Every structure is written in C-alpha cells, then in structure tokens.
C-alpha cells in the first residue's frame, strides 16, 4: 500500500513537471515571436557586419544616421537623450509626475529642460552630476 502511494505521488509530480515545462516553453515561444530584435551576440554581429549603412550605425537601435549624436534612444516614448559635456549622450527615463511629465514630451526640446531640482532627474541633473555637483 505504501509503495503504491509513493508511485502515485511520483507519477503526479512527474506529470505536473511536464505540464509546467510545456506551459513555460509555450509562453516563451510566444515572447520570442513577438521580439523581432537580435537575440544572441552572433546575430548582433551579423546584423552589424551585414548592414548597408554608409554613415554611422547606432549600436542601441541599429539605425543608420549621419553621426553618433543623432542616434535616438531605444525607447523614445519613455526616455530622453541627454548630451554630456564631452559630446556623448546618455538616455535616461523621462521625469514623471503630475505637471512635470508633459514638459518632456517633445524630443526637440526635452533635452534642454533643467528643472534645477535635484529631486527631478532630467538632463540638467545629468549635467550637474557629470560635473560632480549632485
């Protein structure tokens, strides 16, 4: 009787593991199909090496632009591009909050805004942090 109980428990555990493994693979497969981007370093290398770009290929987005300073942020609806004093740039999350986030919606001007408040992380804050003032 005890052996049958052990066998039944083992069979249920094995069946449950197979079902969860199937569901996990099923869900992962759906995500992979939605993600059209590069998945491995080899694929990334292939995309870069086979690019037809004769100017500058942005490493984060794969877009062909005139110069590195024209590369967009990977997530432009939620990020702003802040220029550093040395000419490079970093992408940071747009500041959020009531009455604040609307100021940062225009990509042509959002990098110029400085709230002059160290509690609001915008491009002004990035420049102050770069100079060691934060």
From Swiss-Prot:
Cite the entry's keywords alphabetically. Signal
> Which residues belong to the signal peptide in this entry?
1-17
Q: Which biological process annotations from GO are given for this protein?
A: ERAD pathway
Record keyword ATP-binding present: no
Is the Nucleus keyword given for this protein?
no
Q: Which PANTHER family match?
A: LONG CHRONOLOGICAL LIFESPAN PROTEIN 2 (PTHR38425:SF1)
Q: Identify its protein family.
A: Belongs to the LCL2 family.
Q: What job does this protein perform? A: Probable component of the endoplasmic reticulum-associated degradation (ERAD) pathway.
Q: What's the protein name?
A: Long chronological lifespan protein 2
Species, as recorded: Candida dubliniensis (strain CD36 / ATCC MYA-646 / CBS 7987 / NCPF 3949 / NRRL Y-17841) (Yeast)
* Highest classification ranks of the organism: Eukaryota, Fungi, Dikarya, Ascomycota, Saccharomycotina
